[in-house]
């Protein structure tokens, strides 16, 4: 009986660890780092929480229709270490900004993405996400805009 309970405990522990690892570290499962794109739009929302922050960006498409993008950020602690705070986002709410994002894969929601870089109205380019493309800020289309 003790052997069965020990085996059951180990199985539950391993399964639980695998699920939590996937839930938090599944970047390449959820986002496509090979199809990153630049978005320009109006900052309309912010969620500053663990394990990731999020912001909303209203972007006009080619036909002039506005689409709202929900974009994932690094953890708030990592953002602060990179020099970006909640107050930076709040100060730019309602203003136009640029973002380099990697879109969500099919099945993970339309108009969802993970940010790499952002450039707010103050002109500062900030690292706010994982960098699957391994590009530098100087390579961004909005570097000199």
Language-model regions, residue ranges each:
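Bacterial N-terminal signal peptides
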Residues: 7-20
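Short boundary/loop segments of OB/S1/cold-shock single-stranded nucleic-acid-binding domains
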Residues: 23-37
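Short nucleic-acid-contacting surface segments enriched for D/E, G, S/T with interspersed K/R
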Residues: 81-99
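Short aromatic-glycine-enriched beta-strand elements
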Residues: 49-60
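Beta-strand/loop nucleic-acid-binding surfaces
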Residues: 68-86
